[in-house]
């Protein structure tokens, strides 16, 4: 992919010592060169306007949280085999289909009047300097969960405000087995402790 991409791609790697998402994201942030970081997970299929939507939604002093539609196992197999080459919110096999509808005017209304949503680390964007200012992800988060929510708390506490992007930045999440969640309780407690600070 690095050889065919029209934009520079740098693969950041670390040894597989369990689920250490916070640590690898920090390595990627440190290696990044741009002023603005759009963070996605590797199991997403991005709608063609995804990057453009994020750039239009970016504001100084803010970070962006988006969402994703969930694709069933059957539809994922069809996509990966090449049987299906494009996705639509109306297709059978897409859950949370309201998350994959792109209506730019509704995005403005939702941001202005809609509720603040819980962050999804699979679809977020930040100014690099803001991430450095709050010292990036807390690498004490081991295993699945809550590292993204805890980061958002620290960003908010540093007067960097959340902008919820809905009806733009469309992404489809491929089906896969869920990560081991044995560390979830300690991660949740660590997140709750950050709220009290």
Regions picked out by a protein language model, each given a short descriptive name:
Residues 1-18:
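Acidic donor-binding segment of Leloir-type glycosyltransferases
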Residues 15-32, 49:
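Glycine-rich, basic loop-to-helix element that forms the pyrophosphate-binding segment
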Residues 37:
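Short aromatic/hydrophobic "clamp" motif used to bind/position activated sugar donors
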Residues 41-45:
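The conserved acidic donor/metal-binding loop of glycosyltransferases
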Residues 49-86:
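Conserved donor NDP-sugar-binding/catalytic core segment of glycosyltransferases
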Residues 84-116:
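Short, flexible, basic/aromatic active-site loop/helix in glycosyltransferases
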Residues 119, 123-135, 141-161, 166-167:
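A short, conserved alpha-helix in the catalytic core of glycosyltransferases
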Residues 165-182:
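Active-site donor/metal-binding and catalytic loop motifs
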